[in-house]
Amino acid sequence: MEKREELYRGKAKSVYKTDDADRLILLFRNDTSAFDGKRIEQLDRKGTVNNKFNAFIMQKLEEAGIPTQFDKLLGDNECLVKKLDMIPVECVVRNYAAGSLVKRLGIEEGTKLNPYTFELFLKDDAKGDPFINESHVVAFGWGTAEQLVRMKELSIKVNEVLTKLFDDAGLLLVDFKLEFGVFHGEIVLGDEFSPDGCRLWDKDTRKKMDKDRFRQGLGDVIEAYEEVANRLGVPL
């Protein structure tokens, strides 16, 4: 597989074209951002940890019948993925109250949500990733009603699979965001799944083991990521 020019540079990953029109290479960088890219720092080992963490999770999801864009690892900080036509919507599943939900509704952080909640946000840093609903998505042409049904269905299945996976490792899956795209007419899970895009707490102590350590200045960010990976059995 030949790596060609950079197609897109995000806050923490770069996307490269390849000699296959249906495949891209994701490069996980050490960049760590918060507050819609307003704060960015370099954290040693982060690109490697997130690349291998993502590969592990995507393979677990594939085994559970969830279609993902992941193909294979290419190195410590690169992987080969399917080229998706991305839908500019973030799907957020919450099992416990945290983050923007706490700010919006005044719920106490850590409150267990029964059942989980499912939310949609427009993927637009300039607008602060605003909270939207299904009718916005369809009305503005960001996705179809049928695609939304499938995205919610897959998000719920991801939650079922990963809640158990993390629980077995002594961790609470507090919440997470997913992005989807279309590949040959099928809705497929895209982007990544790592501690950058979810909240993970130790089940006993409620210690935060995710990017909130960076957002809130708690320190030991990568050490926490590595501890989560080690508990899951991710080969780093």
From Swiss-Prot:
Acyltransferase is among the record's keywords: no
Gene3D superfamilies per record: ATP-grasp fold, B domain, Phosphorylase Kinase, domain 1
Record field: catalytic activity: 5-amino-1-(5-phospho-D-ribosyl)imidazole-4-carboxylate + L-aspartate + ATP = (2S)-2-[5-amino-1-(5-phospho-beta-D-ribosyl)imidazole-4-carboxamido]succinate + ADP + phosphate + 2 H(+)
Pathway(s) where this gene product acts: Purine metabolism; IMP biosynthesis via de novo pathway; 5-amino-1-(5-phospho-D-ribosyl)imidazole-4-carboxamide from 5-amino-1-(5-phospho-D-ribosyl)imidazole-4-carboxylate: step 1/2
UniProt keywords, alphabetically: ATP-binding, Ligase, Nucleotide-binding, Purine biosynthesis
GO biological process per UniProt: 'de novo' IMP biosynthetic process; cobalamin biosynthetic process
InterPro entries: SAICAR_synt/ADE2_N, SAICAR_synt_PurC, SAICAR_synth, SAICAR_synthetase, SAICAR_synthetase_CS
GO molecular function: ATP binding; phosphoribosylaminoimidazolesuccinocarboxamide synthase activity
CDD domains cross-referenced by the UniProt entry: SAICAR_synt_PurC
Keyword Plastid: no
Enzyme Commission no: 6.3.2.6
Any one annotated GO CC term: cytosol
HAMAP family, per database record: SAICAR_synth
Homology family: Belongs to the SAICAR synthetase family.
Protein name per Swiss-Prot or TrEMBL: Phosphoribosylaminoimidazole-succinocarboxamide synthase
Gene that specifies this protein: purC
